[in-house]
Amino acid sequence: MKKTIIAATTAFAVSACSTGFYGTSGQDSHIAGYALANNGTTLVTMGSIASPAKMDTFTLSNKLDAVAYRPVTGELLGYSNGAVYSVDAKSGKLTDLGATFTNGAMISKDASATAMDFNNAIDAVRMVGSDGTNLVYFPVGFGDQDKRANSVLKFTSTFYVKGDSNEGMTPEIFANAYTNAIAGAKASSTFQFALDSKTDSLVSLANNAGELKTVAKITIDGKAVDLSSMGGFDIVSAEEGSDAAYAILQLEGESKAGFYSIDLTTGAATLMADLPMGGFSGFAVSGGK
């Protein structure tokens, strides 16, 4: 069943920058957003992130833990512990892709969140659990007869590197996003950011190595915040080197979430719109062309 939710939005207009955000001028009006709600049983779609509080919702046939947009093909994929799905963003229909999970390639059922995003340099998707589990799904057709195609492999669990300001802290990654998410093609390089609800920080994540380095604390209006693990984070790129970061954030103690732009240098979150609901898990945006 499809439902439409419309709420008042915050009007805004900001200028573009390579490490921050585009803003909601005409260049953003064609970018769609996708999220999960109601414990992963509902797909939420934003026809345009220029009006993020105008949403359509679709009841899913299976619970999903996360969603990710595949820049090379324009597909939306979903992950549930033990399965990878293609997701029809216009209906919410799920198709199990029959992925093989290697030994240990599972995120704990007790994990509060799962992050998921495509590495556009290799066209494979990384899933990171708040429990530290670090997985990669290599899609159908990956590489040239690559034996990893349509399988999920486990890599080094996430940890803060020696000398980091959060060294010794147990991370709770709930969202991740790669730069250079250009539409329709692989990127020459990418860099992975993530959000940690335990340290309330924007961090870098060194792919298979699992190494975390703190970039900055997340702030709103210059003040530190207490992030919950409900929400998501993604980057859209008009071209290589031009990255716009967006996030759905819900603060601890709040019942509803907000839609924010994220400065990838300072960690500053700028409110773009108050959303009419909370409890989101996962977030993805479509390509930027």
Enumerate the language-model features and the residues they cover.
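Structural signature of eukaryotic scaffold interfaces centered on beta-propeller domains
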Residues: T19-D28, A66-G74, A105-D123, G168-S188, ...
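Blade-level signature of beta-propeller repeat domains, shared across WD40, Kelch, NHL, RCC1
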Residues: A268-K289
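Short, solvent-exposed loop/turn segments at conserved positions within beta-propeller repeat blades
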Residues: D28, L36-N39, Y79, V128-S130, ...
